[in-house]
Curated annotation (Swiss-Prot):
Protein name: Polyribonucleotide nucleotidyltransferase
Species, as recorded: Staphylococcus aureus (strain NCTC 8325 / PS 47)
SUPFAM superfamilies linked to this entry: Eukaryotic type KH-domain (KH-domain type I), Nucleic acid-binding proteins, Polynucleotide phosphorylase/guanosine pentaphosphate synthase (PNPase/GPSI), domain 3, Ribonuclease PH domain 2-like, Ribosomal protein S5 domain 2-like
Domain KH: 557-616
Assembly description: Homodimer. Component of a possible RNA degradosome complex composed of cshA, eno, pfkA, pnp, rnjA, rnjB, rnpA and rny. Interacts specifically RNA helicase CshA and RNase J1.
Length: 698
């Protein structure tokens, strides 16, 4: 990489974009500093000197949010950044997906992309800056990379598309779309939307691609100026004679029939047996440890299986389980299967099954998100778990990984637009989707299961949501789009295009591909085919439960809303929180108080809610002119008595207002602790209350 500092500038969505090379991180294979407005990201690309064994490309993308970038000190005892949060993990995945297909086939060197956010301007997306930085770091390095690529964020406000909307604009946008690609095609899409149509989504994607093309041209100019020398990479060549022999054996032993097996586990077992039979043909009795040859034969077999699956789909329009290209697997669903939970839904599609379980909590149970932006209170959460047994395997039980975090976030995006507002449903909602069986499209099964759980729980959602995953097999001059892909089609196909939405429109999409990019024609056809599939699944779900239940579970907390004057909030809280803690200790309720005076009281026991409400009403109660009260004498003065109307509110009962008869001394008729009925006659501008007993005698 060049050791001389060079600076390149352009404009991006009305803000300055600067890329600097040659000054920082010079021992990395490639490094750039991206300045976008006040956002600054350092992106580096490093590759190992030797390739790794295995049949996969070891690419790792990291995205690190440094709290100093937003002028914050990390929380916790150690006061330093820990493991990446969910948002950082999702951004790393977002960058990985458009970059991964653009490395040479067979390249097995470890490649690590590091993105460090050094300064964060919320209106100048650090995520999109890091995507451009990752592309540029690879492009100016000696690592073989068929880029550059770029990514943009697209919003949709009042019928107009916007590139990289500000935080304020995102609040009112019907679309939050991230799209990436190279000059000729789109190769990554991620979006959340408020029921927008397929045509609106298509236009948004290619509106974004126009800006991507300009950014790619800018990057290419930098590459042409720097002229990096790339590593020479020559893929290993197959022994054609060996390939032909293995191919002949697979035909002999019925590869087509082995692939065309409905049951996933049976198919996998049959393929393993077929491979073992063929490998045995090559084991030299005199040299049983000929591992290189055996490894080569296995690699050829895997390629032949892939070719056969793709040939069957593209040429014969037959899928491994016998379905047509646009056919959905058998569907089954149930609700209310877990009696003590607040809501549950079981959704099964073929050999993929998800159990979604919903829990309702008080508003105070929200998740606090403390990242580079302002603190955020999240009251709807969707979590996704993928245990080993779901694919018939064993292994260590670990914390959720990148894939589980990503699938959980996709489901959350798909569902958050149908979640009712706090005013209509004052609860925190958490859904956990447990994948019990998987043969592809488990993330979309979790979306369907979560919709069932929401309706089973009685959450007044705006509309049901269903999800489906689309696949693609391309040939030189043709392509076949697949509806509801299974695991083998995902692994051996060219695309995984997930689409979720209501009957009216799309709420989330996610597209990953293994080829260079997709044309407008393919994306348009895939969206339409997904719409038809989504509606078919929706109709099935509505036969199980057609609307949210009218009552919550008996085990769910009940939430009552009441309103007090904002200046009374301090009375309810008390000094150091003393009063509110007393209420909670006595009743066991959860109390959430908003700045506008709205109070949410939550508990399973309605009697405890009622008691908490009574206490708050007593604390915040105000005297009213004309009302009568049973008051208690608290203090006696020469000019009258101070009487307590109710806790926290006293009134002056003037000596002239005690009786219609003349009184010489207050003590002659009243003593401390006496009860006397009074009527409120005046409340002055300072809030002082005057009362009268005489008015009740006249």
């Amino acid at each position: 990489m060049s050791q001389e500092k060079k600076v390149f500038k352009t404009e991006w969505a009305g803000r300055s974009l600067t890329i600097e090379t040659g000054q920082l991180a010079k021992q990395a294979n490639g490094a750039v500093l991206v300045r976008y407005g006040d956002t600054v990201v350092l992106s580096t690309a490093t590759a190992s000197k030797e390739p790794r064994d295995g049949d996969f490309f070891p690419l790792t993308v990291n995205y690190e949010e440094k709290m100093y970038a937003a002028g914050k000190i990390p929380g916790g005892f150690k006061k330093r950044e820990g493991r990446p949060g969910d948002d950082a993990t999702l951004t790393a995945r977002l960058i990985d997906r458009p970059i991964r297909p653009l490395f040479p086939k067979g390249y097995k060197h470890d490649v690590q992309i590091m993105n460090m956010v050094l300064s964060a301007d919320p209106d100048c997306s650090p995520q999109m800056a890091a995507m451009i930085g990752s592309s540029m770091a690879l492009s100016v390095s000696d690592i073989p990379f068929q880029g550059p690529i770029a990514g943009v964020n697209v919003g949709y406000i009042d019928g107009k598309y916007i590139i990289n909307p500000t935080v304020e604009e995102k609040e009112v946008s019907r679309l939050d779309l991230e799209v990436a690609g190279h000059k000729d095609a789109v190769n990554m899409v991620e979006a959340g939307a408020s029921e927008i149509t397929e045509q609106e989504m298509l236009e948004a994607i290619f509106f974004g691609h126009e800006e991507i093309q300009r950014l790619v041209d800018f990057q290419q100019q930098i590459v042409d100026h720097i002229q990096p020398v790339k590593q020479e990479f020559i893929p290993a060549e197959r022994d054609e004679a060996l390939v032909e022999r293995v191919k002949s054996l697979t035909e002999e032993k019925g590869l087509k029939e082995t692939v065309l097996t409905f049951d996933k586990q049976q198919r996998d077992e049959n393929l393993d047996n077929l491979k073992e039979e063929i490998v045995n043909e090559f084991i030299d009795e005199e040299d049983p440890e000929n591992e290189l040859l055996i490894k080569e034969v296995y690699a050829i077999l895997n390629e032949l299986v892939k070719e056969e699956v793709r040939r069957l789909i593209a040429d014969e329009k037959i899928r491994p389980d016998g379905r047509k290209p646009d056919e959905i697997r058998p569907l089954d669903s149930e609700v209310g299967i877990l009696p003590r939970t607040h809501g549950s839904g079981l959704f099964t599609r073929g050999q993929t099954q998800a159990l979604s379980v919903l829990t309702l909590g008080a508003l105070g149970d929200y998740q606090l998100i403390d990242g580079l932006g302002p603190e955020e209170e999240k009251r709807f959460m969707h979590h996704y778990n993928f245990p080993n047994f779901s694919v018939g395997e064993t292994g260590p039980v670990r914390a959720p990984g990148r894939r589980e975090i990503g699938h959980g976030a996709l489901g959350e995006r798909a569902l958050k637009y149908i979640i009712p507002d706090t005013a209509d449903f004052p609860y925190t909602i958490r859904i956990v989707s447990e994948v019990l069986e998987s043969n592809g499209s488990s993330s979309q099964a979790s979306i369907c299961g979560s919709t069932l759980a929401l309706m089973d729980a009685g959450v007044p959602i705006k509309a049901p949501v269903a999800g489906i995953a689309m696949g693609l097999v391309t040939r030189e001059d043709s392509y076949t789009i697949l509806t509801d892909i299974q695991g083998m089609e995902d692994a051996l196909g060219d695309m995984d295009f997930k689409v979720a939405g209501t009957k009216e429109g799309i709420t989330a999409i996610q597209m990953d591909i293994k080829i260079d990019g997709l044309t407008r024609e393919i994306i348009e056809e895939a969206l339409e085919q997904a719409r038809r599939g989504r509606l078919e699944i929706m109709n099935h779900m509505l036969q199980t439960i057609d609307q949210p239940r009218t009552e919550l579970s008996a085990y769910a907390p009940k939430v009552v809303t009441m309103t007090i004057k904002p200046d009374k909030i301090r009375d309810v809280i008390g000094p150091g929180g003393k009063k509110i803690n007393e209420i909670i200790d006595e009743t066991g309720v959860k109390l959430d108080i908003e700045q506008d005076g709205t109070i949410f009281i939550g508990a399973v026991d309605q009697a405890m809610i009622n008691r908490a409400r009574e206490i708050i009403e007593e604390i915040t109660r105000e005297a009213e002119v004309g009302q009568t009260y049973q008051a208690t004498v608290k203090r006696i003065e020469k000019y009258g008595a101070f009487v307590g109307l109710f806790p926290g509110k006293d009134a002056l009962l003037h000596i002239s207002q005690i009786s219609k008869n003349r009184i010489e001394k207050v003590e002659d008729v009243l003593k401390i602790g006496d009860t006397i009925e009074v009527k409120i006659t005046e409340i002055d501008k300072q809030g002082r209350v005057n009362a009268s007993h005489r008015a009740l005698e006249e």
